[in-house]
C-alpha cells in the first residue's frame, strides 16, 4: 500500500543522471530510476512524497488533487548530455510568466541511447493531460533527441499538435569533439551510448524536423571562436557550422560558452519571440540556417 510505504517528505536533488521524468503535472513529476526501475513522486520543489510503482505514485498524485495546468500549450525544455534542468537557468520561469506551461525535464542522458531518451519523451507526452500543443526548447544533445522523437510515428501526435522547436547549441551536423574522443574508453565510460552517437555520420542520418525550427548558436561572431581545437567560430564545444541545419526558419549567434548560453539573460526574448511568431525578431539574424 502506497500510504504505508510513503515516507515523510524527503528533499531530493531532483534527479539528473539516474532518474527519468515519466509523468509531469503542474510542476509535480513521477520519475523512474534508471537502474532499479522503481518510481518516486516529487513536488515542484523536488521533495519526494511517494515511491514504489508507477500506479502507486499516480494514485498519490491524484489523492493530493494536483490539477493539470489550464494552459494547453506545453513547452518542454530538454537539456544536453551530462547536464540537468538547471542548464536553462530561469528561462522556464520566464516562459511561464509569459503564459506558457514550460517545464524543464530530467532524463539520464549518460545512461542510455538517443533512442531510449526519445522513447522517454514519447511516454511523457502520451501521459500529458490537458495539452493541445507542445513546443520544445533544447540545449545541445537535447535537440538531437527531439529530432529523433519528431522523426518517429508517435501516438501522442494524434491528439497533441507539435508546435515549434528552438535548438540552442545543437550538434546538428554531429560533433568533431565527439568523433575525436569517441574511441577513447574514458569518453565512453563518462558519456555512455548517447555520447557515442553524436558523430557526424549518425546525427546527419536523422530527418529534418517537419515543424518550424530555429537555431541559436553560441560563439564569438568571428572566425576563431573560443576553442582553437574546433574549426571556425564555436562555443568551446560545438562549432557554429555544426549547429546549422537546412530548413531552419531563423538562425542567430549569441555570445557565450556551450554550458552557459542556454541560461543567458539575452536568450529569453528570442525564445519567446520564436514560440509566438516563428522568428527570433529584433536580433542579429544569419540567413540560410
Predicted feature locations:
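Flexible, membrane-associating and regulatory peripheral segments of lipid-active enzymes
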Residues: 1-75, 84-89, 93-103, 119, ...
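Serine-dependent carboxylesterase/thioesterase catalytic core
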Residues: 76-81, 96, 101-211, 235
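Short, solvent-exposed loop/turn segments at secondary-structure junctions
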Residues: 82-83, 110, 172-173, 219-223, ...
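Generic hydrophobic alpha-helical membrane-span motif
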Residues: 85, 146-148, 175, 241, ...
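Short, contiguous clusters of charged residues that form electrostatic/catalytic patches at enzyme active sites
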Residues: 86, 116-119, 123, 266-269, ...
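Residues that form or flank phosphate/diphosphate-binding pockets in enzymes
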Residues: 86, 112, 262
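Short aromatic-enriched loop/helix-cap "lid" or pocket-rim segments at secondary-structure transitions
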Residues: 89, 116, 175-181, 224-229, ...
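C-terminal catalytic-base region of ester-bond hydrolases, centering on the histidine
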Residues: 209-289
